[in-house]
């Protein structure tokens, strides 16, 4: 994925209709906005700095409205709970008002359940609300250039046709439609961004070898929202599922209690969401609610003693009782970040994420390059294949058999569902694959043209015919379908 490194720009800005009187009208007409850190303004130009700050704040708010509009108007959950917005092409600031209303309602719900807090609980709430948080995005992709980190949402990447894959699935999009946000785990310790994160997993998942850490004071965070769990699968992993087994093992009763769904209302998947203003109070009050319900006296004593004094202890508590997830609208672009390698990256991960700098460091022999090419074939990664073709000399014999871990022969892999036509064309052009060679294992006797027809891949079928594929070799199931596919 390439890194965007430019100042905010508008590819299209339609002015509000004359006499509309709607201050949010311009926000609804914004489209094609890209954001990056504003250019540096010298200390002597205070007026310019103030103006630039106001423009940047407005653009962030306008973009955030589109992200929330997409979520609230299209997520089936919000329709079920009566919180949906009307679908439209562009969204005004009412989308942000919807977030604020939900946040207030969810905060009021836990406040009502708790009633008055005692002095120890008030102290704990104050401790959490005054603490400095950091947000952690884990990935295998190359998301920075050493000076600027630019992390885009799934929606933005797809719109610009530069996605290298991700962790947003059809179920997330259908239920929540929150794929125009960048997702982060939360570090509660108060340590600086330059300190290595204390947590390397989120809801039991390892999302990448590198962590990009930003402070909660970042302007891009101000229109974000927080959930106490993974927003889609809003269950806290408990006991043996928890990341920090040494900590959870010290409080077995607490470990048994943490594995739970956190939701408001009758729908189990209705994870409460909180805006930036309310998020710290929400975490504090939900922790107090958990403590009141807990039967683990030792854990409660630890919270009101050790966690009040130690940032690391507080982080262990909050990342065991919750798995908080923070969401920044559309794009997080900043120079105020730190990158932390958490573990060595695997070759497969570098290919899957199209991280060419990391791939170059991992491929030190022709054998490595061949394995990387098989991964590129398997995942349809054109950029990786082009990189390898430009840096290594291959022969047909290099691909005669698949490396360990790959289960399809070359011809089948090159024409499998989702395979890259570019990579197929490169292999056929170089004579590394025989266009009419029958499969020997899966669907024995069929050819690559059968796969192209079976999967309805017109572009692949045309490429195969260009390279001499014999339609007479098509199986009886596919023989009559080729002309219709090519029509």
Curated annotation (Swiss-Prot):
PROSITE patterns hit by this protein: ANK_REP_REGION, ANK_REPEAT
Activity: how regulated: Interaction with host calmodulin (CALM1, CALM2 and/or CALM3) is required to mediate arginine ADP-riboxanation of host caspases.
Compositionally biased tracts (Polar residues): 1-12
Effect of residue 137 to A: Does not affect ADP-riboxanase activity
Region (Disordered): 1-27
Positions annotated to bind ADP-D-ribose: 139, 143, 152, 154, 157, 166-168, 183, 207, 230
Positions with a binding annotation for NAD(+): 137-139, 143, 150, 152, 154, 157, 167, 183, 202, 230, 325
Active site: 325
UniProt effect for mutating residue 330 to A: Abolished interaction with host calmodulin. Abolished interaction with host calmodulin
GO terms classed as biological process: symbiont-mediated perturbation of host programmed cell death
GO molecular function, one term: toxin activity
Residues carrying the site annotation Important for catalytic activity: 137, 183, 207, 230
GO cellular component, as recorded: extracellular region; host cell cytoplasm
EC numbers: 4.3.99.-
Stated consequence of mutating residue 207 to A: Does not affect ADP-riboxanase activity. Abolished ADP-riboxanase activity
Function as written in the Swiss-Prot or TrEMBL entry: ADP-riboxanase effector that inhibits host cell programmed cell death. Acts by mediating arginine ADP-riboxanation of host caspases (CASP3, CASP7, CASP8 and CASP9), blocking their processing and activation. ADP-riboxanation of host apoptotic caspases (CASP3, CASP7, CASP8 and CASP9) prevents their activation, thereby inhibiting host cell apoptosis. ADP-riboxanation of host CASP8 also inhibits host cell necroptosis. ADP-riboxanation of host CASP3 also abolishes pyroptosis by preventing its ability to cleave GSDME.
Record text on subunit structure and interactions: Interacts with host calmodulin (CALM1, CALM2 and/or CALM3); specifically interacts with the apo form of calmodulin and calmodulin-binding is required to mediate arginine ADP-riboxanation of host caspases.
The protein's name: Arginine ADP-riboxanase CopC
Organism: Chromobacterium violaceum (strain ATCC 12472 / DSM 30191 / JCM 1249 / CCUG 213 / NBRC 12614 / NCIMB 9131 / NCTC 9757 / MK)
């Amino acid at each position: 994925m390439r890194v965007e490194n430019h100042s905010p720009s508008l590819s299209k800005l339609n002015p509000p209709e004359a006499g509309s009187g709607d201050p949010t009208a311009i926000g609804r007409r914004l489209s094609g906005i890209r954001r990056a850190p504003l250019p540096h303004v010298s200390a002597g130009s205070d007026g310019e700095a103030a103006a630039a700050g106001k423009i940047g704040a407005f653009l962030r708010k306008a973009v955030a409205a589109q992200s929330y509009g997409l979520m609230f108007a299209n997520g089936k959950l919000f329709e079920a709970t009566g919180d949906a917005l009307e679908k439209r092409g562009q969204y005004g600031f009412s989308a942000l008002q919807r977030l604020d209303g939900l946040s207030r309602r969810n905060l009021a719900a836990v406040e009502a359940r708790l009633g008055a807090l005692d002095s120890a609980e008030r102290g704990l709430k104050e401790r959490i609300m005054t603490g400095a948080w950091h947000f952690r995005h884990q990935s295998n992709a190359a998301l920075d250039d050493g000076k600027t980190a630019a992390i885009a949402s799934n929606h933005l990447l797809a719109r610009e046709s530069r996605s290298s894959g991700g962790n947003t699935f059809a179920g997330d999009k259908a239920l929540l439609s929150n794929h125009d946000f960048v997702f982060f785990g939360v570090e509660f310790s108060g340590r600086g961004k330059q300190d290595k994160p204390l947590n390397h997993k989120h809801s039991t998942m390892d999302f990448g070898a590198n962590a990009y850490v930003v402070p909660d004071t970042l302007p891009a965070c101000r229109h974000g929202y927080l959930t106490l769990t993974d927003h889609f699968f809003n269950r806290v992993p408990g006991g043996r599922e928890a990341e920090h087994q040494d900590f959870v093992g010290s409080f077995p009763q607490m470990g048994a209690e943490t594995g739970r769904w956190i939701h408001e209302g009758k729908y189990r998947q209705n994870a409460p969401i909180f805006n930036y203003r309310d998020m710290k109070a929400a975490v504090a009050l939900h922790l107090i609610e958990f403590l009141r319900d807990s039967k683990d006296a030792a854990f409660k004593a630890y919270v009101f003693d050790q966690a009040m004094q130690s940032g690391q202890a507080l982080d262990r508590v909050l990342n065991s009782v919750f798995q908080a997830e923070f969401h920044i609208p559309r794009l997080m672009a900043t120079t105020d970040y730190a990158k932390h390698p958490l573990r060595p990256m695997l070759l497969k991960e570098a290919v899957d994420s199209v991280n060419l700098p990391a791939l170059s460091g991992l491929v030190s022999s022709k054998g490595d390059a061949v394995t990387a090419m098989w991964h590129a074939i398997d995942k349809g990664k054109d950029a990786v294949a082009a990189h390898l073709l430009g840096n290594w000399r291959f022969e047909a014999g290099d691909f005669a058999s698949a490396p360990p871990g790959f289960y399809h022969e070359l011809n089948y892999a090159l024409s499998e569902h989702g395979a890259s036509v570019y990579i197929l064309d490169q292999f056929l052009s170089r004579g590394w694959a025989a266009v009419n060679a029958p499969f020997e294992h899966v669907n024995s006797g069929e050819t690559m043209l059968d796969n192209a027809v079976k999967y309805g891949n017109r572009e692949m079928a045309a490429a195969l015919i260009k390279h001499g594929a014999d339609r007479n070799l098509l199986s009886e199931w596919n023989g009559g379908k080729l002309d219709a596919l090519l029509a």
